[in-house]
Structure formats: structure tokens, C-alpha cells
Amino acid sequence: SAFGFAGQKCSAASRAYVDESLFDEFVERLVARTEAIPGTSPLEPGGFLSPVINSAAVARYTAAVSDARLTGRVLTGGERLTDGHHERGHYVAPTVAIVPDDSTLWTSELFVPLLTVRPVATLDDAIERANAVPYGLTAGLFADDDADIGRFHARIESGVVYVNRAAGATTGAWPGVQPFGGWKRSGTAGKAGGGPYYLQQYL
């Protein structure tokens, strides 16, 4: 869910907090999967990689990548794509980066295909970091412990929450069909739930 639509989706994943005991293996697999994304045109069968919308988005991407390189590490991606069919659009490579805690990449909405990753010691640490941003539209968790899942649901400041959704960790709701709205600067604390009459339309 980080790189579909070139990250230009309001629910695209932009941050991943990973249990420190799994971090190295997770990053290795993430980088391998990212580098295996087909570079074919989105108009062709099997095409996945879309262009960003305009030159301003390319500039946002370029600035974010430069910041990641200056303060942290770009693990894969980080380039403008201009070969073949990429020459006629604003194509940029899906990017994975490790950046310090004070980087603005943790707290900015970029709408480009860039995912930051960080190890955490505990679920509570991950929740606190996830909540320490001005946005709260979607969040996702992969866990097998019911108590951890319950704690995440209770504490995460996000309007839409997914658990163990392999097809997209932070995306998948159908706006207009399912409740879809956010907290903080992503909405107004849950009004997208539909109010007192929302549930009745399903009865």
C-alpha cells in the first residue's frame, strides 16, 4: 500500500515501525520486493508503476530523497526514471529509506512513493510514534496476539484501522460504502462514522 498509485493515495503507507527482532529480515524482504516491482507501463498487462501527477510532485520527491540521503540512508530507489516509456511522464522509483527520528519525513504528507522504516522495541513505542504526527487517516498492524491487537485498536489515533490485511496494510476501505475518515488534520475525530443513523442503514 506504499507504492500503489505512486503513493498518491490518501491512505498510502508512508511509515513502517517494525519489531526490532524482525527488522533486518523485514528490510531485506521489503527492499527485494520493492526492487521487483515491474517497471512496465501502467497501460500494459502487469504494469504497476504509475507516474506522479506533475513536476511539483517530482520536486517534492527529489527534496525528500535528498533529505533522506543527507540525514539517513536510502536503501533502494531515489531516482527519477527517464528510460523508455518513462521519458513521457513524471516517473520516480519506489523508495525505502531509514531516517532519524527528527526527520520531517516522519511527519509530512508527501503523496510520493517513499516509505520510511524504523525498528521499535515494543508495540507501545510504535503506537506512541505513530500518534506523534498531525495526521491520522489510516493505520495498519500485523500481529498474532489478541491483547496486542486490542491495545492497538484502543490507542491508535486513526480513523480507519486494519489488522493483518496482506493486500494493503493501510488501505482497502470503499469510501461511500464503509466508514472512511480520519482524526486530527486528516478529519474531525470520527464524524465519518456516520452519526446516530449510520448503523441503521445496514439493518
Regions found by a protein language model. Give the residues of each.
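ALDH superfamily catalytic-core signature
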Residues: S1-D101, D124, E128, V163
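Conserved C-terminal structural/oligomerization subdomain of aldehyde/semialdehyde dehydrogenase
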Residues: S1, T34, P38, S50, ...
